[in-house]
């Protein structure tokens, strides 16, 4: 099995899980955050909805500067409802899947750089960046999102087995 097959299987498994979580994001609470230093619910949910698209950046670009000195700052997409989030996830997963289907192990072994303000903060083979910087990072933020949802009283869907909210009895 090659990297692409593994990552495609991960994407196919994790996308429906993320969809179930995003469907539970309560409209009207997107500016809420559990702590003053935490990110807002809407921003965190937007990340969970759009992170699969990052696969295309890792496959198609040699580097990414997340805070370019003279370049544009990140402008998050205007996602205002759980329906917007689910639609964004479906589009991002489709783009991520296409990027993975268009690459191979030789390309994924090539180096990829993450920069901030022109300074290299990480340089790894693309397959490592996909695993750590995209897929595991995505799952991490989805986990954070479930905590936010629980604090808001939402029922948590099953992730890798039944949740306490979905258990019978």
Region spans (language model):
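Short N-terminal signal/transit or membrane-insertion segments
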Residues: 1-2, 48
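Active-site rim elements
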Residues: 3-8, 79-86, 131-135
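Short, contiguous alpha-helical
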Residues: 8-23, 29-73, 114-169
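Helix-adjacent hinge/juxtasegments
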Residues: 57-58, 64-104
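Active-site-proximal loop and beta-strand segments within enzyme catalytic domains
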Residues: 106-114
């Amino acid at each position: 099995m090659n990297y692409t097959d593994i990552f495609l299987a991960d994407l196919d498994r994790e996308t429906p899980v993320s969809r179930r979580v995003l469907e539970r994001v309560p409209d009207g609470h997107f500016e809420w955050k559990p702590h003053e230093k935490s990110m807002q619910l809407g921003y965190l949910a937007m990340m969970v909805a759009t992170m699969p698209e990052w696969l295309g950046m890792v496959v198609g670009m040699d580097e990414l500067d997340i805070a370019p000195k003279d370049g544009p700052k990140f402008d998050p997409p205007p996602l205002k409802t759980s329906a917007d989030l689910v639609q964004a996830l479906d589009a991002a997963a489709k783009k991520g899947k296409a990027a993975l289907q268009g690459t191979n192990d030789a390309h994924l072994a090539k180096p990829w750089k993450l920069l901030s303000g022109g300074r290299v903060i990480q340089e790894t083979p693309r397959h490592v960046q996909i695993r750590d910087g995209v897929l595991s990072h995505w799952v991490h933020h989805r986990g954070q999102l479930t905590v936010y949802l629980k604090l808001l009283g939402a029922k948590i869907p099953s992730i890798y087995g039944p949740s306490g909210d979905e258990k019978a009895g």
